[in-house]
Every structure is written in C-alpha cells, then in structure tokens.
Amino acid sequence: VHLPDILHDLRTIIQGAVYSKKQDFYIDTEDMLHEDIITDRLRLTQVLLNIISNAVKFTPVGGMIHVGISEQPCGKEGYTMVIFRVKDNGIGMSPEFQEHIFDSFTREHTVTENGIGGTGLGMAITKNIVDMMGGRIQVESEVGKGTEFTVTLECELSGMTTKPESAS
C-alpha cells in the first residue's frame, strides 16, 4: 500500500463535506518515514474514513481537522509501527461516553440533542476492524474542545522504501 495514495483518496472523498462546512483540513506526513507498507488497503481506508468523517460531522462550521501520520520502531526487522492521528476542535465527548465509544449503538446524549444523525455503530465497527488488523485504537477528548483518535498498526515494510528527503 502506498500511503500517499490512500491519503489522496481520503482527501478527495471528504473534501465536499469539509468545503461545505468551511473547515480547515490538514494532512501532515512530516513524520512518516516509509511511504509503502504491507496492509489491507480497504480496511485501512475504511478505518480512517470513518474517523475523519466523524471529525467533519462533529466539528462545527469553520472548525479544524488535522490528520497526522508518524512512525516508531517496533523492534522487529522489516516492520514499523505506523501511527495515524485524527484530531479536531469539535464538540468533544464526556469522559463517561469515551468509556463506551467503541460499544455498538452507543451515542453521546449531546449528539442526539443536537440532531446529529447516526446509528452508533461506526466506531464499534472501526474498533473491530483495527482489532482484526492487530492494531490499537485510542481516544482522547474534552467536551467543547475536541477529540483525537489514534490508530496504531504494526506494518511490514514494502520493499524497504523510505520517504524521499525534501530539499532544504
């Protein structure tokens, strides 16, 4: 999987919603060392698209969504830990809701009060996919301040290619 292609596809899919809400949408690959990894492209795209779509949905007009990719060594030859972060300055979540965000049919009461649609299945499905990929998903949030989701996956490197150095 060529990560820049996935990021381009995600930006293309989400740009209409971002534009209609006049949001700022950033993708930061500065700390991404390897562009090519071996993983399930469809599942990775589904996970990231669901998290980013929620960020757009729960971030008000004029808000900001930041997607970052970084890496950490995992101590296994030919593998790396890829860390995907999606951070927004949206409505946020209560600590109580964060404990149940990955349960099926779970929705925050402020969401239902504000009339924001959804079934409460998206994050349960997302966690299930991340688990099947052998990864980890975490959430940090504060009501009224925003939310950050972090997905960490151990990925095999594809051909040991590294990101080209930018000219300084």
Summary of predicted features, one role per range:
Residues 55-56:
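Short helix-loop "hinge" at the ATP-lid/N-box region of the Bergerat-fold HATPase_c
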Residues 117, 122, 126:
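Short alpha-helical Gxxx[C/S/T] motif in the catalytic ATP-binding
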Residues 3, 92-100:
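Short helix N-cap motif at coil->helix boundaries in the Bergerat
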Residues 1, 19, 24-35, 72:
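Conserved catalytic submotifs in the C-terminal HATPase_c
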Residues 1-12, 24, 45:
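A conserved beta-strand-to-alpha-helix junction within the catalytic ATP-binding
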Residues 16, 91-92:
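Glycine-rich G1-box
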